[in-house]
Amino acid sequence: MTTSNTPTYASQARPWLKFYDQKYIDQTMPACTAFELVCRQNKNRLGETALEYYGRKFTYADFIVNVKKTAAALRAAGLKKGDIATVVSVMTPEIIFAFYAADMIGATLNLVDPRYSVEGIREYIEEVDSHLLICLNVVYERCHQAAKRTHVEHVVVLSPADSLPLPLALGYKIKNLDKNKYHSNVIHWKQFLAAGKDESIAAEPYDPEHACVVVHTGGTTGSPKGVMLTDNNFNGIAMQFSACDTLFSKGQSLLNIMPPFIAYGFACGVHLPLTLGIKVVIIPNLDSNKLGSLIWKYKPEHMFGVPSHYQQLAVDPKLQNKDLSFIRNYAAGGDAIARGAEQTVNDFLAAHNVEFPIAKGYGMTEASSAATAAAGRNNKPGSVGLPLVNTLVSAFEPGTDTELPIGQRGELCISGPGVMKGYYNKPAETAAILRTHADGRVWVHTGDIGYLDEDGFVYLDSRIKRLIIRHDGFKVFPSMIENVVSQHPAVHQCSVVGCADKDHVQGRLPFVYLVLDPAVPAAKRKQIIKELRQLCIEELPEYVQPVGYKIIPEMPLTLAAKFDYRKLEEEITPRDY
C-alpha cells in the first residue's frame, strides 16, 4: 500500500509492468524504417491479405510491389531524401502506398485534412515548402487555388475509384462525373506510376531522425502545429501493442475508419495492424449511420474509433439482434468517454456476446497517438488504461519536473518510444512541451490533469485549459459532472464547458450541453433536466453544481472528431442560465 510516509513514484515503481510478459518488457525497439518493419514481420506471409478496399484485396506481396512502384514515381516527380510532399486526401490504398514509399526514399508526407479551406491548405503547403502536392480529385479545385503563390510544381490527382474493383469503379465514375478542369502541371495517379518505371527503387538507409510524416494538432487548445513523427515513433507504437498478444493475432482484421491526417489514423489504424499481420479494411469516408452495417459485413476483430462511434453502435437497430462475439478489441480514443456512456457501451457489448468491454486509450498527437491502453481484462471503469509496456506515464507538479506520488493529481507527462521528434519549424513551442527532466528522459508535458492508481491505471480528469476556475478559486473538472450526468438513461451525450459568472467580475461556472436519446419525447425534456439537477445535487459538491443545462440536437465536432468545446462555449447566451 502507498502511504504518506512511503511515497511511491510511478516512473520508478512502474506497477503496470506486472500485467505484461517479461519478453515485452525487455524488448528492444527495431532500428529500421516503418516500411522495413512491415516487410520483416510478414516475410513468410506474402500471400496473405494486407489491405481490403471495397472487396479488392492486396496481399503483402501486392503491397510491397505497389509501395516500390510509388517510390519510383515519387522520385520521378522530383521528390528526394529530406523533401516534404503535401497530401490532401482521405484514406485510400494509394495514400498508404505513398506513406511507405516516401518513408522508403527518406522523404516525408505532410498530411492535410481535405475539409480545410483554400487558405488553410495553402498555409500548410507553405509551412513545409512542398514542391509536390497529392490530392483527391474531389478537392482538386480547392487545392489548385491553394497551390497558387507556393512552390508546388507538380500535382498528382487520385480518385477514390483508382483501386476499386472494376464494376464498382465504373459505377463510381458514372455517378461521380469528374468535371474538373485540370491544369498543365497535373498528372493522374496511373500516369504518375507509369512515369516512374525507369527510376530506382533502392531504399535510403535507415535514419533515426527521419520524420515519416508531419501531422497537425487539432487546435482545440491553441493554434495547430505540425508534429514530426519518425520511423521509431510508428514502430514503437506497433511493437508495444504486440504485448497485447491475447488480443492481436496474425490473420485477424481491423476496420480502419479514422482518417490519415491524424496520428491515430495512421499509427494505430494502418501501421500497427500491418506490422502485426492484421488485415486493414479501408473505409475512406465513414458515414457513421452505416457503421453498424459495415461491422456486420466485415466482422472485424479490431477497430480504433472515438467514443461517439461506440455510443452510436449501442443504439443501432441493425445490430440489436446480432451475435458480435467476433469482436476482440474495439477501442475508443481521441477523446474522453464519460462513465455513463462507457457503461452503456459495455452493457451493449456484453448483451451481444462480446468477451471484453470497450477498450480505451490515452495519448496525443505529440505521443504518436497512444501512451496507454485499457484492453482485454486489463481494464478498469473510468480509467484510460495502463501505460504501454515500454512507456512511462506519471503525474507531475504542472509545468515542472517534480514528480508526484502515485494517487496524487497532477499534470500527466509521457516518456517513451512514441514521443515526437518535435514541432515542425517551431523550436520554442517544442521546448515548451518536450522537456528533459532530472532523470535524463525527455517527457511530453500534456497539459492534462490526472493521476495513477496503485496498479498503474491512469485516470484523466481534464485538460488544464478545460479547467473551470470559479470566482472563489475552486477548480471544477468537467469530467466530474460529465460522469454523473451521463449516468441518466435519457442522456446520449453530454459536455460541460465554462460560462461567465454573472454575479462576479471574474471566474466561470460549469454549464452542461446535452444530446438526449432519440426515443425521448420532447414533452419530457423539462422533467429530465429537473432530474439531472437533482442527480448532481445528490452526487456532487455544492461548488461543482452546473449553473445551466441546454439540450441540442447533436454535438459540434472538431476536424479530429472530438467535441468542439470552444464552439459550445461561444454559443452560450445569458438567457441560457
Could you describe each region identified by the protein language model?
Residues 301-305, 314-381, 392:
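Gly/Ser/Thr-rich phosphate-binding loop
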Residues 235-253, 261-304, 308, 312, ...:
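Conserved AMP-binding/adenylation subdomain of ANL enzymes
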Residues 1-58, 62-77, 81, 162-181, ...:
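N-lobe entry segment of adenylate-forming
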Residues 179-216, 223, 246-253:
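Conserved pre-ATP/AMP-binding loop-to-beta segment of ANL
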Residues 59-61, 212-239:
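Conserved AMP-binding A3 loop
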Residues 158, 538-563:
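AMP-binding/adenylate-forming catalytic domain of the ANL superfamily
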Residues 116, 133-135, 303, 416, ...:
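AMP-binding/adenylate-forming catalytic core of the ANL superfamily
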